Amino acid sequence: MTVLAATSAPQRYASLGDYWNLITSVFPASSTPGVNVSYVNAAAVSQAETTSGRQITSAWVTFSGNHVACENASGGTTLTNHPHEIHEILDPDIQKALAAARPSPAEIGREVVLVVPRTFTVDGVSGITDPIGITGHRLDAQTHVVTASTSQIHNLVRAVPQTIDVRELVTQGLASGESVATPDERGLGCVVIDIGAGTTDISVFIEGAIWHTAVLPFGGQNCTNDIAYVLRTPVVEAEALKVNHAHAIPAEADGEPSIEVSLHNRSRDTVS
């Protein structure tokens, strides 16, 4: 994959969940409730088209928010009813197994948005990642199923510019994990934590497959708000302090010079 452009459109507000991100092949940026998300998305797409010199006609749309839930499921299909016959597994057989491993949402107002294959089992032999061409009597699929609020998903799709075809919906955590973790890292097992402004997305990979996804309804904006509250400084100033001077590891802050900040009454004070 080649990244042709990376663009973003600014937004005024950040909520503690339900972040809506638009990802195309050139990775434009995010939008949130509380602003005109259609306008923000269109602006990001326009910038990406200008930068890449190409027209964007389709997109993978990622979503996040505390309405997202996941579970691991399994299901299968019989390949042949004759005990002395074997069947070569083809793509339609895989689709049948995946459909059997797609549970229905237990709650009204929710829907299955994504079914990710983890592994397959053929006649009791497990751990198969690609069963195409293998012969057997029964095929079972182990899947990672993501459900979400039907209304949230509907609003998300409506926020995508009408000129763009939504190819697939993907969780933000899964997209981040597939992007930043190498196949070897996912194979050994890893946790990918994507800290956004209003949400933190967590993805757990085991033996190369996604096993768990979660969304925590807080992120970097919470840190900015805390700095603004404690120092009684504007949010814009607090964000600049966080980006330019904050350290996640206290030892790295040793020797950091004192800095001046703007206070709520427009005076300035020195902090360290």
Q: PLM features: what roles do these ranges have?
A:
Residues L188-V230:
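Glycine-rich phosphate-binding loop of actin/hexokinase-like ATP-binding domains
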Residues T2-V191, I210, P234-S272:
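Nucleotide/phosphate-binding catalytic cleft detector across ATP-hydrolyzing
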